[in-house]
Amino acid sequence: MKKILLFLFIFLSTFATAQEHKKVLCPTPPMGWNSWNCFNKNISEEQIREIANLMVSTGLKDAGYTYLNVDDCWQTHRESCVIQSDSVKFPSGIKALADYVHSKGLKFGIYSCAGSKTCAGRPGSRGYEYIDAVTYAEWGVDFLKYDWCHNNGANAREAYFTMCDALKSTGRPIVLSICEWGTNRPWEWGKGI
């Protein structure tokens, strides 16, 4: 009887620990707002702050729309390998903007690409995944829309798993949104991310 109890104790302890490590960041589709369809390339810190205010004042936040995502064209170049935001469009910087969004009880999202460039031709994350992930974590990013432009024939599954591993390595919970267009059957491998 003691052996059975010991076995059950070890099994249940191991199972509980394994379940803890499989914690899902976003068990349902995230609800929120993305800047691309509204502003395209013409985004600014002022607009994003205004959208954050509106998400709260109009009741969207209370209805579950908690993610505010800044899409492509927030970035301009890399400095010592670190992605830099457009200081004209975002004079306070991305960290300050994320802090503002968080102060409204919302989650802050940002955009990048698995290719060498984003869809709009800005610097992508290819080859900089771990550096970008650390930068995003330092800024307080909660969500990453990860696009598939300028990928030079890369393996989609490997590219998305690389960014997933990079985000996990930061210790900050950042939801990874696979924006791969469906050409590489992400429904077969995306759940593992």
Residue ranges and their predicted role:
Residues 123-124, 183-193:
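Substrate-binding cleft/loops of secretory-pathway carbohydrate-active enzymes
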Residues 51-153:
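Aromatic-lined carbohydrate-binding/catalytic grooves of carbohydrate-active enzymes
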Residues 23-27, 60-63, 101-103, 137-138, ...:
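Extracellular/periplasmic catalytic domains that process cell-envelope and extracellular macromolecules
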Residues 157-174:
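Short acidic, glycine/proline-enriched helix-loop-strand junctions
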Residues 108, 174-176:
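Hydrophobic beta-strand scaffold residues
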Residues 19-49, 54, 174:
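N-terminal module-boundary/linker segments of secreted carbohydrate-active enzymes
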Residues 1-20:
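Bacterial Sec-dependent N-terminal signal peptides
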